[in-house]
Amino acid sequence: NSGIANACTGKQGLDCCEAEAKCAGELLGVPTDAVLVASTGVIGMQIPVDKITAGIEKLVAAKADTLEAGSDAAHAIMTTDTISKEIAIETQIGGKTVTLGGMCKGSGMIHPNMCTMLGFVTTDAKISKKMLQEALSEDVKDTYNMVSVDGDTSTNDTVLLLANGLAENPEITEKLSLIHIS
């Protein structure tokens, strides 16, 4: 959600996140704990859950597996950004085509009106949880974790890396894997 950060909102804020995740999970046919919620906006205000869940219903009805839908999502998360930030690539791993896509928003300004950095990276690569976390941690230490605008960071800065393994490539289980990536 954009407009309200849902930070410093106590149990009611947590309940709002859980309601959003439950709504999305039910509509998408996935477990609630498979839904991740990210927020950007004003700190300390409560989220209008009814408005958000109505929006989730519209998004699920309009979802598509197209480049245009991905671009629409990248534009939808923009706040103070002047351009969307998105990329998608395909490569071969172990003779299988693997896709990696990413989008992010922020950070044009932080202080005095904090603006959150949100980053979402998805892949259909088959990779172990350990290697996925290691790749993300190694990447953000020299990128996202070095960003400071006006000497501040946001309460809600988020980077998510998700892999579903549907590419059916040989599983990446070690950093210096013998799998040829071209």
Sequence positions of predicted segments:
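Short, surface-exposed loop/turn segments at secondary-structure boundaries that line and modulate
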Residues: 3-11, 33-52, 148-171
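Glycine-rich anion/phosphate-binding loops
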Residues: 11-19
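Glycine-rich, mobile lid/loop segments that gate access to catalytic sites or pores
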Residues: 18, 23-142, 154
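Short arginine-rich
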Residues: 143-147
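Conserved small/polar residues in nucleotide/adenosyl-binding loops
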Residues: 179-181
